[in-house]
Design a protein with these regions (language model features):
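Well-ordered secondary-structure scaffolds
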Residues: 1-267
């Protein structure tokens, strides 16, 4: 049986990052098309505005080459980056430094969210309550990346959020967590609408990730899989016996039968 391959963490030799002014028409870019930039190079001056108290300078956030300049609005930078893929996202695009707020299988607690998290993208196992989302938004957190959260809390929250596994309280994929832990403090771009977190690569940095490879692979017993059936959407488990079109999957100690078309192989 062939199943789609799900690569959660992928290195891309060519990625594009848009750096926008907080308010269109309010600011001036220093760079032009063809300019080479580094992550902490200033690329624009941003004057004081209602959403931007005090004059500031906008950094590139990534290293690469400016390939497009939209005067008074944005620039497009060609770079190399690592993409972390989720299954469900909500909210506007945001950016910030990665901050580990909880272990891969632990909840992001209210006590872990404080003023020091401002301008960060928080990472943890799962978000247990709506109050955590509300406090994170109140202190200036830019977004959350986690394994899952309750559907009701997800729907009521306004904070940009990327669920790597799905609804409920599944732990964050271990490979994803280990990668994000390794690059904690790195600037990242959260795009919930595209179900993706883009992590800038630093010059000379070597990440233990793979480039996009096979799209389908033969499902074998013992493989790590992700379930996309309604009752267990997004949960991870181990493939067991394959009988016709059905696959036995072990989930948290329980065994369920899932149609092969509703499984993805994790690599």
């Amino acid at each position: 049986m062939l199943c789609p391959v799900i690569q959660k963490v992928i290195f891309s030799k060519q990625a594009f990052v848009e750096r926008r002014l907080p308010v269109a028409g309010h600011g001036k870019f220093f760079v032009k098309k063809g300019t080479k930039v580094r992550p902490f190079d200033f690329v624009a001056e941003v004057p004081e505005a209602p959403r931007n108290p005090g004059s500031q300078r906008l950094t590139a956030g990534v290293g690469g080459e400016v390939v497009e300049v939209l005067s008074g609005r944005a620039i497009l930078i060609k770079t190399s980056a690592v993409s972390v893929r989720g299954v469900i996202g909500k909210g506007e695009d945001e950016e910030g430094e990665i901050r580990i707020a909880a272990d891969y299988n632990a909840p992001i607690e209210l006590s872990a969210v404080d003023a020091g998290c401002a301008s960060n993208v928080l990472v943890g196992g799962f978000v247990p309550t709506l109050e955590v989302f509300k406090k994170a938004e109140a202190v200036g957190v830019r977004g959350i990346v986690c394994g899952g959260t309750d559907f009701a809390a997800f729907q009521k929250s306004n904070l940009p959020t990327l669920l790597i596994e799905g609804f409920g309280r599944p732990p964050l994929n271990r490979k994803v967590f280990e990668f994000l832990k390794k690059v904690e403090g790195r600037h990242a771009f959260l795009s919930p609408g595209h179900e993706e977190l883009l992590v800038a690569r630093l010059d000379g940095a070597v990440e233990d990730v793979q480039e996009v490879g096979e799209v389908f692979a033969k499902l074998e017993e013992g493989m790590e899989v992700q379930v996309f059936s309604a009752s267990c959407f997004g949960q991870m488990g181990k493939a067991g016996k394959v009988q016709g079109d059905m696959v036995e999957v072990s989930l948290n100690g329980d065994k369920i039968s899932v149609p092969g078309r509703n499984l993805g192989i994790i690599k």
